[in-house]
Amino acid sequence: MKALVKENAEPGLWLADVPEPTIGSGDVLIKVLRTGICGTDLHIRAWDGWAQQAIRTPLVVGHEFVGEVVDTGRDVTDIKAGDRVSGEGHLVCGKCRNCLAGRRHLCRATVGLGVGRDGAFAEYVALPASNVWVHRVPVDLDVAAIFDPFGNAVHTALSFPLVGEDVLITGAGPIGLMAAAVARHAGARNVVITDVSEERLELARKVGATLALNVSDATIADGQRELGLREGFDIGLEMSGRPEAMRDMIANMTHGGRIAMLGLPAEEFPVDWARVVTSMITVKGIYGREMFETWYAMSVLLEGGLDLAPVITGRYSHRDFEAAFADAASGRGGKVILDWTA
């Protein structure tokens, strides 16, 4: 089968022929229809410092996908050939305290699809049945392909109650954009999102942000004044991983404010912990999705009319992956989709 492979320990990806995956008794074989390009895939392609430490070549990359089940292991009873599915990209041990308690997203032995094992940028992918989400109601294929990052957005945005709250989101990348859409849909009063890309800020306006603020020429305090906020933001969603974004967020929270932090910093940085303590701010780290509560919430949000169409800005055949990756790496748009049927 054709697959996008990190063949060598150097920058680049290769469209190559590799063997089709085999399945065990509890696994599912899936024909891939479409995939989404993630920031993780960009790091692997660029072969940056993180990738050099985390990746062992050769590796089929990719973890965001939608496909159709073509075969199941003998012990799989609730998934059948023909089902339209997406997959949870974090594979867990099933044996640790957190897994046994049902907190699978907290497993210390998590292995990432397309990072620690062959992934989904291929004509076929195999997963344990426990990692397969069946779309029981129709979902647009492009949206179904990005259920993984959509789950990151939902997990982060719904970490705290949002109804009537003023929400600050730092970082208007694809996950930040989806979080803005979720926050508005879930009843937030104001949703302010910051970035330095006007193209992405325009996408934020399309998904319903109350105010899309370019912090290269305005401050979050300016945004507060424009909206008439006098006490700061109730909820903060940090999506950028930028030190200055986290510091600005803390400085603009109300007393008792709550911050969910998904953005992954590249290195340690100082934080005004005195402000966190004296303002009684809660900071919660987010990694991945809650399995499968977040997936259920995603489906319900879409059934309820949540529109993610503006977030998807690029569509390419998998054969045009070089152009697709360049688009995704530009930092100007939203999610980029690879079509494995074209």
UniProtKB/Swiss-Prot annotation:
Q: Give the EC class as a word.
A: oxidoreductase
Q: Name one Pfam family in it.
A: ADH_N
UniProt record, GO biological process:
L-threonine catabolic process to glycine
- Annotated active site residues, numbered on this chain, are 40 (charge relay system), 43 (charge relay system)
- Residues annotated to bind NAD(+): 175, 195, 200, 262-264, 286-287
GO MF annotation terms:
L-threonine 3-dehydrogenase activity; zinc ion binding
UniProt cofactor note: Binds 2 Zn(2+) ions per subunit.
State the family it belongs to.
Belongs to the zinc-containing alcohol dehydrogenase family.
Its subunit composition reads: Homotetramer.
Q: What is known about what this protein does?
A: Catalyzes the NAD(+)-dependent oxidation of L-threonine to 2-amino-3-ketobutyrate.
What this protein is called in its record is L-threonine 3-dehydrogenase
Origin species: Streptomyces coelicolor (strain ATCC BAA-471 / A3(2) / M145)
Q: Which gene encodes it?
A: tdh
